[in-house]
Amino acid sequence: MSCPHAAGAAAYLKTFHPDWSPSAIKSALMTTGTSLVASLAVSFLFEFYGSNYVCFLVLTAWPMNATNVYEEGEFAFGAGHINPVKAIEPGLVYETLKEDYIKMLCSIKISFFGTCPKGVKGSPKDLNYPSMQALVESDNSFTVEFPRTVTNVGPAGLTYKAKVNTDSHINVSVKPSTLSFKSSGEKKSFVVTVSGKGLPKQTRVSASIVWSDGIHNVRSPIVVYT
């Protein structure tokens, strides 16, 4: 049911923003996802009202982290549970054009769709996608850079600051760490740098960055694996 659920959410979002591209809609759904999972344990709360007892069903939740429940981290839960209501006003979106996908495919020598432009450089990690992942060699130090560009779809005059969530296995930095937008539709670029000392074989490490202006929280998951 995940596919029709996401398709319905995208159609719902399109009614509010008919001029948005498919990549903008996808970005809005991904970056506003809720990184909480409902508890499998169900508890009941009984309260006495007048002469009757009223039963309340209580569901608990906890953050989606790389724990023994979700030991594969972001690989297991991705961008989280989509929230179509929050996606209506995502604040920022990552837009990806057809030319960006062609460049990405050409960089990995896939050209069944036609002729690749000469001198194409880059790699899949350069695709302006709302998430970031990299395969690194095990037991070796590494540094990976992810260039990204976001578009302000909110009002003018907003300033976003980057917050990094990571663990001791990798270091994540964002430059610049502050983005100020003078107008709606304005674009700003930044680079996310992920580095580490050596990860054992078959290791998956999760992190994330969140751009926040105090109202909007634009979250992008990061995965490094060997």
What residues fall within each predicted segment?
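Loop-rich non-cytosolic ectodomains and luminal regions
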Residues: 1-226
